[in-house]
Swiss-Prot record:
InterPro entries: AAA+_ATPase, ABC2_TM, ABC_transporter-like_ATP-bd, ABC_transporter-like_CS, ABCA, P-loop_NTPase. It comes from Dictyostelium discoideum. This is ABC transporter A family member 4. Keywords: ATP-binding, Membrane, Nucleotide-binding, Repeat, Transmembrane, Transmembrane helix, Transport. ATP 2 binds at residues 1331-1338. One of its GO terms (molecular function) is ATPase-coupled transmembrane transporter activity.
Length: 1615
């Protein structure tokens, strides 16, 4: 627990810092929950403020309404009889009394008589009549038989309620007030009373029951029932889980980039990791939770469930969501779709919870379903809504309801269950890296007791010695140094360790039964060719990959069962950088210091500062890691490995890869300083590095241990004397006769000598020990004939480690093949000319193969959209149709008995004798009424809201001095027909009290006359259409976003850039992607088309409109997504963001359009429709998703696309199908054109370049080197004479006054990367760029390749101006980036085939060319495996091969030998010597030996400026000061070796800090008294041989000159 506590604080600080670095993401995490819950409350608030009308409204007014251009239809079978006509006359009388100004003719025209009901129906439905008809009255044949007067009121069926229904909770009786029903009813009733001599003017009004939802919480009832009950759980889940979207993406990215496993290898406790992420996430998550609970409770949306109960539900639910996020992360290895998929899964579960909450299943089953917490929250949402609604009987009683406390219990149980699941999955699912435990691990004793394996003795070591285990086919006991038994026990013991990988060619053995021991205070180096198993061994020791067999002990713990204990003591610097680009150097070091044992914050800060200074990052402490150069990142990773008091086992893989000579020596000193009390395993390809640093060296080839021992042991075992290295002048490289002459001279003096290698300018000879007496004579002759033999210099040393390595590897199968015929096939197969169709073929093959290999992503990108679309189709065909108007014409007698035996409260205002008598004789006579005092009526109705259909209030009112009997009908909203029934009841009772007769009123609706909107809605399920359109937009948004993610990935990994530089036409790149992505998208289109045509005849009928729309839509959304991808560098983030934009914009535009269009139709407003058209034009122009949704709506006849002035007939008219299709076509053109304009921007700018647009390059320094100044003169003459171009191009590369300044961004200051460089490089020359990290080498190559735009200056390639004729200038260039731009899902063979087609190699030659490169680079064994699994060195081989394909005239090689072994490096030198015969090559390197071996001319750069320029010898002559003597002392002379050496060479001086046993001296060579090499060798052999293990003598080396010239560089601030 102590370790968890110690790690928790730094993890929290790291996570919080990372969260705080991205202000936008943090803001979104806070805003997204608010937006989600805000949308819910916006909808709910609208439902609350759109309240019912509670005002008193007139139910009378017949005479007033009919007089305003309205007609009343009246009739009876055979015509009106006398009684019926009396009623008609009294109706006319009412009009004439109300409007005495109207003539009788006018009044008569207001009434239309009919003799049969069919004629009345026909008249009503005539389009020319129905707008002027207020309704009709029909008298049945028995209308005046007996004591009942019968008549029927006829209005449009949509102006009444469904006569077959008596109750409903969404409508009320106000519809009868608004559409003249009650006006006709009261008018006819008044006429009947007059006919029966009852001359009481009656005025009726209607009013909804007083709102029973008095309290604020009650006002939410409608929204609570319609919205919160059905969608609340999903909204709450969405609002809370949105906070975790970033967490999921970041965790999966940490897995993907090996950062997570890197932390684990250095002791990270998984529990601490999850706890720290939980705490940081819970800060925002719980804030959102508290906010949601406060909103729900404070708004009183949730009322009967207390706030504390809400908190007790939402907090554990938030925790379960967090745990679900962690669990889902275990199943994602790529960040592409992780966040989005997790979000959809959780929302889906929450949606299922809505169904379960409402479903009448047993409480036990409901609680069991709550094991999925998103289901639980939806069930809880149902419970708290239910509690608030049951008060008003708004929901039916559910006997299977669970209570909120049971749900709280389940959520708490879920927390513990999910923790258990996470613990289990964390052990058995490790992803790509890490060792998974067996599924039954928790049942084993080893897991709980941490037992050692049986072959380990009590001292924590293996019983079997390592040497007895190494018994492979190539085993030779003499090659293994015996370990002194007095040494302490080994800290690392490896026994029979083996690892096999499955590849395209079957199983490949990476490590073959390795057995070895390592000890404290010692550095153990692994040497071997690329892919020999070195990094794989380290990965097994750190637990990143599982051994196939064998075991290893580290500090007594075995790696199979106790890896967690081992990791507490590890410091690891892997081959790839495991850093967060947002964190600073100091933040990295402080974090890992805390992770590895420093508990005091001040101590961490001091240690971090100290170690940063020692690795040369002192002034970068506060710089984000993303701004560091490649070499600086390696320094940071090395510092991370060493920091911490518990790091006593250090594993470092290529620590100085990419570092210049000066910084490399700095790192050597650092490693030696920190070696004490540590066991260090070093993997490196710098043999000098291993020689200087290592106590023990193991050489591995083909996964087998070939030898093991100290450097001296290996040299004595494999060396047979001295190594003579002769550097020839560059003009004699291909002179085989010269090589023979030099060899003859040497063999004449040393008959037993042998030629070891002839690579580039370098000749290496083996001179046996017994011939040492002949050395002086040999050196004397070489000195005398130095010019004649074209020898620049020579040196001699005792057997070097490099020689040992080359000798051992030369006997293995890993040696690259310099077969001349193979070389010619590979390097001299020229491009036959770039062909568009060939490039297109290559790119399409690439997409097919990457999709096939990443089948999970491919299936998900297709399957998920298909599933979403399938859901839309299911809803479209199966969702219940909702009628938007009432079609029921069945008659309904408006009788009080419709609502049973309910008692009606009656109130009388101003009680007097007349009113009392009227009440007693009429309504009061009924046993269905009860008298309630007026001042108590309001409260009575509120408290008796349920179960009372209506109430009555009576008083007398005056209008124009006429006294009226007024009664107000209070109607309950749930009783659909209450208002006309109560009017009938009152009027009938008044008639009965006087005549004994009753009135029977019947509602007999006309068949509904459909409006244009309703005509458009015939047989249309508009709710189903809305869901179908939404889910269709979602599916296409997702697939379009997934395609954009691929583009972002290729751009961020620079694959796209390399393709362009290799000659790919940009239009072909986009065409290939469009073709493949269109094909993939059309899988979705075909699925949609087949299904929708099969199930819906509308799509069959209008197939032309649908198919044109979906095809144009597909053609438009892909390029739009490509365009949007330019703003993203991460695949996962691109997919998530682009999906949200596509779907969100399309959905919002569609909803707005539908609302506006429906409003225009309902209001029959041409002007509003015009405004809607303008808005839609804008939507069309912005979003193709809106265009397609409109087409779907048109085909499905959605009412929201109808028009006021146009019949919905012509599907291809302008405003219907034509316009969106035309706009979609324009979208295709616009987005593709926009992409090409962006991509071709450099070419376009070049065509219209104005020289003034370029900044003037800075004026060269006054003290500029004379050779650099002379080069400016030469280049100016070349440019003035236009010496370039044509097939005979002499200078393929010319750049003049080249200048690049990076402007300041944010906190980063502006920087001049290249000051003012001028060079001309002819064909046949290899030009070397040397310089410190960050001096401008890679920037120079970037400008030459066109990747970086220069700030000023001019570049000419192959005779063409790069700015003005970009395409021609870049026609024949090969580029090898500093960081491999390889497609991880393709093998070496597949990538080479791709670039052969890109560069125009003839199809018939591709196979042979690719085979030649694979054979030449020794890649046969892995040629069919994906390059993502290659070692760094093998990746460099592939990258160099790509650059060389097609025999380009210009090669730009950036650190080509970085990370490759010595054998391959020498092979590359030979390749370069062969290549340069007809090419101009620029090589950047940190290997001085490489520069000397292959470069005809070189420059040393410092702070963007050229400091020296010329051949190797010229620079040595100009800046050197004599001879350089490098020595390695015997151990016993470590203290006084320098002093003894200076005694023998008094004029010498120590020119570099001593590194362990190695030292470098400078010996002046004055021109007036020159010293011969032979005399130096003689002096060493006679006076110093006894104190030296090794030495070499040469002219002052380029490396020493390099260190001298770059000593005060601002890019080398720490030196």
């Amino acid at each position: 627990m102590e370790s968890i506590k110690n790690q928790l604080i730094p993890l929290l600080k790291k996570n919080w810092t990372l969260k705080g670095k991205s202000k936008i993401k943090l803001l979104l995490e806070i805003l997204l929950p608010l937006i989600s819950i805000g949308i819910l409350f916006g909808i709910l608030y609208l439902s609350m403020i759109i309240t019912r009308d509670f005002k008193e409204r007139p139910a009378s007014g017949f005479a007033f309404d009919i007089a305003h251009t309205k007609q009343l239809l009246i009739g009876s079978n055979g015509g009106l009889n006398s009684d019926q006509r009396n009623i008609l006359d009294n109706l006319k009388l009412q009009v004439s009394i109300q409007h005495p100004e109207f003539s009788n003719d006018y009044i008569n025209r207001c009434f239309v008589e009919f003799k049969d009901i069919e004629s009345m129906d026909e008249y009503f439905h005539d389009p020319f009549n129905y707008r002027g008809v207020m309704g009709g009255v029909w008298f049945p044949d028995d209308s005046f038989n007996g004591n009942t007067i019968k008549y029927s009121i006829r209005v449009d069926s949509d102006f009444t309620h469904d006569n077959t229904q008596q109750f409903q909770d969404r409508e009320d009786s106000q519809i009868y007030l608004r559409h003249y029903f009650t006006q006709i009813q009261t008018g006819v009733d008044q006429a009947i009373l007059l006919t029966n001599q009852i001359a009481i003017p009656i005025f009726a009004t209607g009013q909804r029951f007083p709102n029973p939802y008095i309290s604020f919480w009650e006002k939410w009832t409608d929204g609570r029932k319609l919205i919160l009950l059905n969608t609340g759980g999903v909204f709450i889940t969405a609002s809370l889980f949105a906070t975790l979207f970033t967490l999921i993406t970041n965790i999966v990215i940490e897995k993907e980039t090996k950062i997570l496993e890197g932390m684990k290898t250095m002791g990270l406790n998984s529990f601490a990791y999850y706890i720290s992420n939980s705490i940081i996430s819970l800060i925002t998550l719980l804030s959102s939770t508290l906010l949601v609970s406060i909103i729900l409770s404070a708004s009183q949306l949730v009322h009967h469930v207390k706030w504390i109960t809400l908190i007790l539900i939402l907090i554990p639910y938030s925790i379960t969501l967090l745990l679900i996020a962690f669990i889902l992360c275990k199943f994602f290895t790529k960040s592409k779709y992780a966040g989005l998929m997790a979000f959809l899964i959780v929302l889906l579960l929450s949606g299922i919870g809505i169904i379960i909450g409402r479903f009448n299943i047993s409480p036990t089953l409901k609680l069991l379903s709550c094991l999925f917490s998103p289901i639980a929250i939806s069930v809880a949402n149902y419970v708290w809504c239910y509690k608030d609604l049951i008060v008003f009987k708004e929901v039916d009683i559910n006997v299977n309801m669970v209570n909120e406390y049971e749900i709280i219990g389940m959520l708490v149980f879920d927390i513990f269950l999910y923790i258990l699941i996470l613990w289990y999955l964390d052990n058995v699912i490790t992803g790509e890296y890490g060792i998974p435990k067996k599924w039954y691990f928790f049942l084993t004793k080893n897991y709980w007791r941490k037992n050692k394996k049986s072959n380990i003795n009590n001292n924590g070591v293996f019983d079997v010695e390592a040497t007895s285990c190494n018994r492979n086919s190539s085993y030779n006991e003499k090659n293994f140094e015996k370990i002194e038994h007095q040494l302490e026990r080994p800290t690392i013991s490896i026994r029979n360790l083996r690892k096999e990988f499955k590849t395209g060619d079957g199983n490949r053995i990476a490590v073959n039964d390795l057995s070895i021991d390592m000890y404290k205070n010692r550095i153990h180096s692994f040497l071997g060719p690329n892919g020999s198993g070195k990094s794989t061994t380290l990965s097994m020791l750190t637990g990143m990959i599982e051994p196939t067999s064998g075991d290893a002990l580290i500090n007594g713990f075995d790696i199979r069962n106790n890896i967690d204990e081992i990791r507490k003591h590890l410091g690891v610097c892997p081959q790839s950088d495991i850093i967060w680009e947002q964190l600073t150097v100091m933040e990295h070091l402080e974090f890992y210091a805390a992770l590895k044992g420093f508990t005091n914050s001040n101590q961490r800060k001091v240690e971090a500062t100290k170690i940063a200074l020692e690795v040369g990052l002192g002034e970068k402490l506060n710089a984000p890691a993303g701004t560091l150069s490649g070499g600086q990142k390696r320094k940071l990773c090395l510092a991370i490995a060493f920091i911490g008091p518990n790091s006593d086992i250090i594993l470092i893989d290529e620590p100085t890869s990419g570092l210049d000579a000066s910084n490399r020596r700095l790192i050597w000193d650092f490693i030696l300083k920190y070696r004490e009390n540590k066991t260090i395993i070093l993997v490196s390809h710098y043999l000098e590095e291993c020689d200087i640093l290592s106590n023990t060296i193991s050489i591995i080839a083909n996964g087998e241990l070939k030898c093991n021992g100290s450097s001296l042991f290996l040299k004595n075992r494999f060396g047979v004397g001295y190594l003579l290295t002769i550097s020839k002048e560059h003009n004699s490289i291909n002179n085989s006769n010269l090589t023979k002459t030099i060899s003859d001279i040497i063999f004449n003096h040393i008959p037993k000598g042998s030629l070891l290698s002839d690579a580039g300018t370098e000749l290496c000879f083996r001179l046996p020990n017994e011939s040492i007496g002949n050395f002086s004579n040999l050196f004397k002759e070489l000195d005398d004939r130095k010019k004649q033999l074209s020898i620049e210099n020579y040196g001699i040393s005792i057997t070097t480690l490099e020689e040992v390595f080359l000798k051992i590897i030369s006997n293995s199968e890993t040696n690259p093949n310099f077969n001349q015929s193979v070389l010619n096939t590979a390097l001299k197969t020229n491009s036959s000319g770039i062909k568009s169709y060939q490039q297109l073929k290559g790119l399409l093959i690439k997409r097919v193969k990457t999709s096939r290999k990443d089948i999970k992503s491919f299936v998900l990108s297709i399957l998920i959209p298909i599933l979403i679309l399938a859901g839309g189709l299911i809803l479209y065909k199966n969702m219940r149709t909702i009628d938007i108007y009432n079609t029921v014409t069945q008659p309904l007698i408006l009788d009080f008995n419709v609502y049973g035996k309910s008692v009606t409260p009656v109130s009388i205002d101003k009680v007097n004798e007349t009113m009392t008598s009227l009440f007693d004789n009429s309504i009061g006579h009924s046993d269905r009424t009860t008298l309630v005092p007026y001042d108590e009526l309001h409260d009575y109705l509120i408290h008796h809201y349920f179960g009372v259909p209506g109430a009555l209030y009576f008083d007398f009112r005056y209008f124009k001095n006429v006294k009226f009997l007024h009664y107000n009908v209070f109607f309950n909203k749930d009783y659909l027909h209450a208002l006309p029934i109560y009017i009938n009841f009152v009027d009938s009772e008044i008639l009965r009290s006087v005549t004994g007769k009753r009135i029977q009123t019947t509602s007999l609706p006309f068949e509904h006359i459909q409006s244009p909107l309703e005509v458009a809605s015939l047989d249309v399920n508009f709710v189903a259409i809305v869901f179908f359109i939404i889910l269709t937009l979602a599916s296409f948004s997702l697939i379009a976003a997934s395609h954009a993610g691929n583009i972002s990935h290729e751009r961020s990994t620079r694959v796209k850039r390399l393709l362009y530089i290799s000659g790919l036409r940009k239009s072909i790149y986009w065409l290939s992607n469009l073709i493949w992505d269109y094909l993939q998208t059309f899988i979705l289109v075909i699925f949609l088309t087949i299904v929708i045509i099969a199930v819906d005849d509308k799509f069959r009928t209008h197939f032309d409109l649908y198919i044109s729309g979906v095809v144009l839509f597909t053609f438009s959304i892909i390029p739009l997504s490509y365009l949007m991808s330019f703003k993203f560098s991460s695949h996962g983030k691109a997919v998530g963001a682009i999906f949200a934009i596509h779907f969100g914009v399309g959905l919002i535009f569609t909803v707005i359009s539908f609302i506006l269009r429906v409003w225009a139709i309902k209001e029959n407003s041409i002007s509003f429709q015009f405004l809607t058209d303008i808005i839609e034009y804008c939507f069309y122009a912005i979003s193709p998703f809106f265009c397609f949704s409109k087409i779907l709506a048109i085909v499905t006849k959605f009412p929201g696309v109808s028009r006021v002035d146009q019949s919905f007939i012509d599907y291809w008219s302008f405003h219907f199908g034509l316009l969106p299709n035309a706009i979609l076509f324009l979208h295709c053109i616009v987005w593709i054109t926009w992409i090409l304009l962006i991509d071709y921007s450099s070419e376009i700018k070049g065509k219209f370049t104005i020289s003034k647009l370029f900044s003037n390059s800075p004026i060269p320094d006054s003290n500029e080197d004379s050779d650099v100044s002379n080069e400016r003169i030469i280049v100016k003459q070349l440019l003035d004479n236009n010496t370039n171009g044509g097939s005979g191009n002499v200078y393929p590369i010319i750049f003049n006054n080249l200048y690049k300044k990076f402007n300041s961004v944010g906190n980063y200051k502006s920087k001049i990367a290249v000051y003012n460089s001028t060079l001309a490089i002819p064909t046949g020359q290899t030009f070397g760029l040397l310089g410190l990290n960050g001096c401008g080498k890679s920037t120079t190559l970037g400008m030459i390749s066109g990747e970086i735009s220069p700030t000023g200056g001019k570049i000419k390639l192959n005779g063409y101006d790069l700015i003005k004729n970009r395409n021609d200038a870049l026609t024949s260039i090969g580029y090898c980036f500093q960081f491999d731009a390889l497609i991880g899902l393709l093998s070496a063979r597949e990538q080479l085939e791709l670039y052969c087609r890109i560069k125009g190699v003839d199809e018939s030659k591709i196979k042979d060319t690719v085979n030649a490169f694979i054979q030449m680079m020794d890649l046969e064994s892995i040629s069919n495996s994906n390059t993502s699994g290659y070692s760094g060195g093998n990746k460099r081989k592939v990258s160099l091969s790509i650059a060389c394909i097609g025999s380009p005239s210009i090669l730009l090689l950036d650190e080509i030998s970085c990370g490759v072994d010595a054998c391959v490096k020498r092979f590359m030198w030979n390749v370069l010597m062969e290549l340069k015969k007809n090419k101009a090559i620029i090589l950047t390197t940190h290997s001085i030996a490489e520069c000397q071996a292959v470069c005809d001319k070189l420059t040393i750069m410092k702070d963007g400026k050229l400091q020296a320029l010329g051949s190797n010898q010229h620079i040595k002559d100009k800046f050197g000061s004599g001879y350089s003597i490098e020595v390695k002392f015997k151990k016993e002379y470590l203290e006084n070796g320098v002093e003894l050496f200076l005694q023998s060479f008094p004029s010498a001086s120590l020119i570099d800090n001593q590194h362990a046993l190695s030292a470098s001296f400078e010996l002046p060579n004055p021109p007036n008294n020159p010293i011969k090499l032979s005399s130096i060798f003689s002096n060493i052999e006679q006076s110093l041989k006894f104190i030296l293990d090794d030495y070499s003598v040469s002219q002052t080396s380029i490396e020493q000159i390099f260190i001298k010239l770059t000593k005060n560089s601002i890019t080398n601030i720490d030196n």
